[in-house]
């Protein structure tokens, strides 16, 4: 029996490998061209150290000088001593080039549609089935897309979960003069080819053991759509609270899809928040951190995922510090304005 294992690196690259039931993780990686750093292969030196972020694994001998009891409690592991017992994801705190891992997968995808889901947002639908058996990625990760007939690339989070038919979705904000935005408005046609590099990013859904708080700003929602799709298919579902902030009512998108999660996820709550609300808006207004409930968040431990503009993320983190809410794990991804930004 093979297990699908994601190897994530500090430069944001992810490589998926197949690991046999009784195979050491290090051996499986090397067999598939990913030469994880190593010295001893005996569980002593600690060179092949990583962290298991999701999945079940066992270790053979681990010397106390390589990993302490505290390290082991934090799911630190040695690839040379690790055997996986389920699909899993591991993080290694070094650049993937050290492993001679090569480039992430570049795929020729086909445009199957562009769907306007708000006045300022579209979903780009791509089909990757002609060029890859199934694209593996972790819910929350992103891809780089090359705008046809240019050297420009833009990065967007997957808005759905991996699927056998390789139908992919990306939530894209339509900017007044954005490179991708202009392409979608003026030149994009069904049947065109887009080159995609994927999967990328260290922002993804870890193994779920505690309640979840998702905080999305603008098209940062895209990453959470993939996560929610994944959670909805799981037999053991955590409670999930989604806070979704946008500038105006016109920016809200995927409202019907978001409300269906209440039917698919047992303990799901959804809180749309408008920062520049009109007089007609009857919901929450202002900024997301102004609507977080200190009492609720202090009652239990939880994992918080944040995706969106840097000011939103910093405001939430500052609020958590000011309220002395410490029993939470925070994972975040900022949308930055650059040649490879998610714009």
Curated annotation (Swiss-Prot):
What are the names of the required cofactors? FAD; [2Fe-2S] cluster
Binding-site positions, [2Fe-2S] cluster: 40, 45, 48, 80
| 2Fe-2S ferredoxin-type domain span | 3-96
One Pfam family this chain carries?
Answer: NAD_binding_1
Q: Which Gene3D superfamilies match?
A: 3.10.20.30, Nucleotide-binding domain of ferredoxin-NADP reductase (FNR) module, Translation factors
One GO term under biological process is: catabolic process
Q: Does the keyword tRNA-binding apply?
A: no
Q: Which GO terms describe its molecular function?
A: 2 iron, 2 sulfur cluster binding; ferredoxin-NAD+ reductase activity; metal ion binding
Q: In which pathway does it act?
A: Aromatic compound metabolism; anthranilate degradation via hydroxylation; catechol from anthranilate: step 1/1
Swiss-Prot/TrEMBL catalytic activity: 2 reduced [2Fe-2S]-[ferredoxin] + NAD(+) + H(+) = 2 oxidized [2Fe-2S]-[ferredoxin] + NADH
Map out region (Ferredoxin-reductase) in residue numbers: 98-338
Keyword set includes NAD:
yes
In terms of superkingdom, the source organism counts as: Bacteria
Describe the task this protein carries out: Electron transfer component of anthranilate 1,2-dioxygenase system.
* Family membership: Belongs to the bacterial ring-hydroxylating dioxygenase ferredoxin reductase family.
The protein's assembly and partners = Monomer. It is part of the anthranilate dioxygenase two component enzyme system. The other component is an oxygenase component consisting of 3 large (AntA) and 3 small (AntB) subunits.
- Name of the molecule in the record: Anthranilate 1,2-dioxygenase electron transfer component
Q: Which organism is it from?
A: Acinetobacter baylyi (strain ATCC 33305 / BD413 / ADP1)
Q: What is the lineage of its organism?
A: Bacteria, Pseudomonadati, Pseudomonadota, Gammaproteobacteria, Moraxellales
Originating gene:
antC
